[in-house]
């Protein structure tokens, strides 16, 4: 294949981005060549063509984001190569450069993103210590977590639903195994060089010690900065100062607890976030999720939030006015990011203007609340946005009106020329008709031939000599004249100049926005906080929640409810619980579907909600401030990891036994069920003894009736059961938690499991047969050597999972 200058240019750029699909701007299309073209054609289902024997596939430039999204979602890294000069102004080969590298975590455009955070993470291990630096490029947020506990770091990555992991080569295989399906980018040692200088440069500070980062965290942050520079092709980044996630301030939740308590949207459907999320702003929704994932452990900070929620709840009129104002607020964080990376569109600036218009009114409404800081109002920027940007602008500068009339005299002059062009064309047309006597003479325009005079074949004999032929059609011919040519030159120059001016003026306005970045981010942060606190106040009113109070060791819940289940269940049954240092271990027995699991989950959720600063679903709640909430629930296997249900169960229990302290809350459901009955009881008993000795608060829901005997050996243990009533042949699950032990008297003569099967809709003939088998078969098998029948009351019969 003969190498043209264009293809040489392409190959030179492609050499620098070998691991990316290169989309190369050619006029109105982005083209991919060679293997990239085959990939693009296959993924996007577009035609594969050829250019000089090179496979080629193209997408229209105006539809770039639509196709780009599909490529990134398919797991590809894409380098965008743009034309850096106007084709009309260059007689040589147009200069082209890569303007960005798109990966799942390096995205700022709204089309790609939901309201939730889109985190990438730089993961580094040094000796036995891990450092994870999370960054949402679209908001500029940076979070750092260090730990010697690999599982803790993995849990955080799962909770944050990271879209991209950036790590050194030595970690790649481990990460792929532990987090399959997540996009991974491997980086070399250069990314970790000169860390302090890199951090100083990007944050524009000389003293970085107030960040209080370890050398490992500093290196990891530096790697993040260099990687974002590489993807955004920019030396200036929109990054907020790093925030450290530590146990000193926050509760660290493992992935099992996040999943078992259904805290955030996932595979299990209804969740706490969806119930509480009545936020009015995208920033507020993201912050609420963060609060749920990181409950506070400092009592004063919790009380501060609760005080704010209570004050807002008490003044319903103000609360409604505040929420109405917040509903006009747009996603300031992401707008600032797009402006910083030169990805903003005119509608972003309109949204920013709308948000700023709310600030003075909001300041007025918040003036009575001392827990809110007065929002800074950038008057000059607001005035500029009001004067410069149209209310309903075109999609991008140069595509139509973006800059308001009156902002630029030069732009107005060219617009006047264009707007009066139709009028002038009509005048020209009338003059030519009079001059030639051709009444059907028309002046028109098309993109190929420009402006023309059209004359029918019947009138060709009247055409003057100064008419220059441009095009012959079936029934007519088209001409031009020196006057029409001059008019066309002026019009085309005006259009071109309008496009140039609009782009230039829009860039200037964006530069002014950049100067106010810090103020805008402060406004965004405070708006998010106001939104979440107002939402929690609204939830408290809507759902009839109560303010919790705190105690060193006492847990007293009266009329407690499950915040999620009650939303989708009629006549939810409230329950009470009392625990303290003397009675800190509660064993709960009862048949399936009686409500054991719901009860222990609601205790966990009430505790967690209190520590995010929310009112809680109870008539009264006195709670300790827990350092951790642990859960071990349900039968789950790990087919991908090759772990059985029982092994998963024991792995999770090992984590709890390793980390639970006197200040922890431990919720256990069916521990020991994944193995044989005797093994299971023995393990469950031994685990219980260990947790009792630790001094943590424990709720243990079980079918092992033997565990109720713990009460006889340990004064810290109390037994609870779920009250079940029988009405004739039917079983009624009251869902009421009472003192005592599940009724042993039924033994093998009665199975609630079969009743559960009946409720689930198993046919009646199958139910009758199950009772027959239970009566005949199980009794025969359970004969002791001495001829006596062994009672099966030792384990409450289960409906098979």
Swiss-Prot record:
ATP binds at residues 590-597. GO terms for molecular function: ATP binding; ATP-dependent DNA damage sensor activity; damaged DNA binding; mismatched DNA binding. One of its GO terms (biological process) is mismatch repair. Keywords: ATP-binding, DNA damage, DNA repair, DNA-binding, Nucleotide-binding. InterPro entries: DNA_mismatch_repair_MutS, DNA_mismatch_repair_MutS-lik_N, DNA_mismatch_repair_MutS/MSH, DNA_mismatch_repair_MutS_C, DNA_mismatch_repair_MutS_clamp, DNA_mismatch_repair_MutS_core, DNA_mismatch_repair_MutS_N, DNA_mismatch_repair_MutS_sf. One of its GO terms (cellular component) is cytosol. CDD domains: ABC_MutS1. Disulfide bonds: none annotated. Pfam families: MutS_I, MutS_II, MutS_III, MutS_IV, MutS_V. Belongs to the DNA mismatch repair MutS family. This protein is involved in the repair of mismatches in DNA. It is possible that it carries out the mismatch recognition step. This protein has a weak ATPase activity. This is DNA mismatch repair protein MutS. The lineage of its organism: Bacteria, Thermotogati, Thermotogota, Thermotogae, Thermotogales. The gene is mutS.
């Amino acid at each position: 294949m003969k190498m043209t200058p264009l293809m040489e240019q392409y190959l030179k750029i492609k050499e620098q981005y070998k691991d990316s699909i290169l989309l190369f701007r050619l006029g109105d299309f982005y083209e991919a060549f060679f293997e990239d073209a085959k990939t693009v054609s296959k993924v996007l289902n577009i035609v594969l063509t050829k250019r000089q024997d090179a496979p080629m596939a193209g997408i229209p430039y105006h539809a770039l984001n639509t196709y780009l999204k599909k490529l990134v979602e398919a797991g590809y890294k894409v380098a965008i190569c743009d034309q850096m000069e106007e084709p009309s102004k260059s007689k040589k080969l147009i200069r082209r450069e890569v303007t960005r590298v798109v990966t799942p975590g390096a995205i700022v455009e709204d089309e790609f993103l939901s309201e939730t955070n889109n985190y990438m993470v730089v993961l580094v291990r040094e000796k036995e210590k891990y450092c994870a630096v999370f960054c949402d490029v679209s908001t500029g947020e940076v979070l750092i977590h260090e730990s010697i506990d690999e599982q803790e770091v993995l849990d955080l990555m799962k909770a944050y639903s990271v879209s991209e992991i950036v790590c050194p080569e030595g970690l790649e295989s481990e990460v792929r195994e532990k987090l399959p399906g997540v996009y991974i980018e491997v980086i070399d040692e250069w990314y970790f060089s000169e860390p302090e200088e890199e951090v100083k440069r990007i944050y524009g500070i000389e003293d970085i010690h107030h960040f209080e980062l370890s050398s490992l965290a500093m290196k990891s942050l530096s790697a993040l900065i260099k990687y974002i520079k590489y993807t955004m092709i920019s030396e200036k980044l929109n990054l907020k100062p790093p925030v450290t996630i530590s146990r000193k301030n926050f509760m660290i939740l493992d992935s099992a607890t996040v999943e078992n308590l259904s805290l955030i949207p996932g595979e299990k459907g209804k969740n706490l976030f969806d119930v509480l999320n009545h936020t009015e702003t995208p920033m507020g929704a993201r912050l609420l999720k963060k609060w749920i994932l990181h409950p506070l452990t400092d009592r004063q900070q919790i009380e501060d939030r609760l005080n704010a929620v209570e004050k807002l709840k008490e003044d319903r009129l103000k609360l409604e006015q505040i929420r109405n104002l917040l509903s006009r607020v747009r996603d300031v964080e992401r707008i600032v990011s797009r402006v910083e990376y030169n990805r903003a569109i005119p509608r972003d600036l309109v949204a920013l203007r709308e948000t700023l218009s709310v600030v003075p009114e909001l300041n007025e409404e918040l003036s009575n609340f001392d827990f809110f800081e007065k929002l800074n109002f950038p008057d000059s920027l607001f005035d500029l946005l009001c004067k410069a940007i149209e209310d309903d602008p075109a999609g991008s500068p140069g595509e139509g009106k973006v800059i308001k009339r009156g902002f630029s005299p030069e732009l107005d002059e060219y617009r006047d020329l264009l707007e009066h062009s139709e009028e002038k064309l009509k005048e020209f047309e009338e003059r030519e008709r009079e001059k030639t006597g051709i009444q059907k003479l028309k002046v028109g325009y098309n993109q190929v031939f420009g402006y023309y005079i059209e004359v029918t074949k019947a009138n060709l004999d009247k055409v003057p000599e100064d008419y220059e032929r441009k095009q012959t059609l079936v029934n007519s011919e088209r001409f031009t004249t020196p006057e029409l040519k001059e008019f066309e030159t002026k019009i085309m120059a005006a259009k071109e100049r309008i496009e140039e001016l609009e782009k230039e003026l829009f860039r200037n306005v964006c530069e002014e926005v950049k100067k106010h970045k810090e103020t805008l981010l402060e406004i965004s942060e405070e708006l998010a906080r106001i939104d979440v606190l107002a939402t929690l106040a609204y939830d408290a009113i809507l759902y009839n929640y109560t303010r919790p109070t705190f105690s060193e060791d006492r847990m007293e819940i009266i009329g407690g409810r499950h915040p999620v289940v009650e939303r989708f269940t009629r006549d939810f049954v409230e329950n009470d619980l009392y625990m303290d240092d003397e009675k800190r271990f509660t064993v709960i027995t009862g048949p399936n579907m009686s409500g054991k699991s719901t009860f222990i989950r609601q205790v966990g959720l009430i505790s967690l909600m209190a520590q995010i600063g929310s009112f809680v679903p109870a008539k009264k709640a006195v709670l300790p401030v827990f350092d951790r909430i642990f859960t071990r629930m349900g039968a789950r296997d790990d087919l991908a990891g090759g772990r059985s249900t029982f092994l998963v169960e024991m792995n999770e229990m090992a984590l709890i036994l390793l980390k639970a302290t006197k200040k922890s809350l431990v919720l256990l459901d069916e521990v020991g069920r994944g193995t044989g009955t005797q093994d299971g009881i023995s393990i469950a008993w031994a685990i219980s003894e260990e947790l009792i000795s630790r001094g943590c608060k424990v709720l243990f829901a079980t079918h092992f009736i033997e565990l109720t005997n713990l009460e006889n050996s340990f004064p810290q243990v109390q037994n609870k059961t779920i009250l079940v009533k029988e009405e004739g042949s039917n079983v009624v699950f009251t869902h009421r938690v009472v003192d005592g032990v599940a009724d042993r008297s039924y033994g093998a003569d009665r199975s609630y499991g079969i009743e559960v099967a009946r409720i689930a809709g198993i046919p009646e003939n199958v139910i009758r047969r199950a009772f027959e088998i239970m009566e005949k078969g199980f009794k025969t098998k359970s004969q002791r050597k001495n001829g006596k029948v062994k009672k099966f009351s030792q384990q409450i019969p289960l409906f098979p999972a």
